[in-house]
Amino acid sequence: MGFAQSDSLAITPPRRYPPSCDCFQGMIDLTPRLAYTYADAKSSHFAGLMLHNDCIACGGGFYAGVHFAGRDFHRVVPEVGAEFYHLLLGYGVSLSTEAITPRVGLSLFNLLRVDAGYAVPWAKAPLFKGFTLSIITDIRLLSYPLPL
């Protein structure tokens, strides 16, 4: 006595999100990140590291680093953040010792981004408050792959 195999009982692997991008293959990259931010007639330079999936088309990651600001860049403000991107659209949130900043922007495959955000300060004399504009680059040539 045998059983006929039905196509309706076929087991299919679960779909990944986002379904249009098959980038999650068990590797993450540690990448240097540089940025320039302007807000409230003040500017700063940012240097840090980004930990993200190994796809440049879509995905996301976390980063940490510091802003260097003020005359002769003596003011140092640490910051951590999370962001997500899909081709041309990027969005995220950053948290520093002085403010929280949600932001959205345009991304060129997460190699170069231009973000606009709004910094909500909690410090008495914050580096940023109000609207912000950032230019961000992840230096993918210096990426270091890490297995999950």
Where are these regions (language model features)?
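Surface-exposed, glycine- and small/polar-enriched segments that build interaction surfaces at terminal
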Residues: 52-61
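Generic signal for short, ordered secondary-structure residues
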Residues: 2, 82-83
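Compositionally biased, intrinsically disordered/low-complexity regions enriched for serine, proline
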Residues: 10-11, 29
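Outer-membrane beta-barrel translocator/channel fold
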Residues: 16-18, 24-46, 65-79, 85-148
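Extracytoplasmic strand-loop-helix segments at the start of, or within, the mature domains
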Residues: 49
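Bacterial Sec-dependent N-terminal signal peptides
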Residues: 1-10
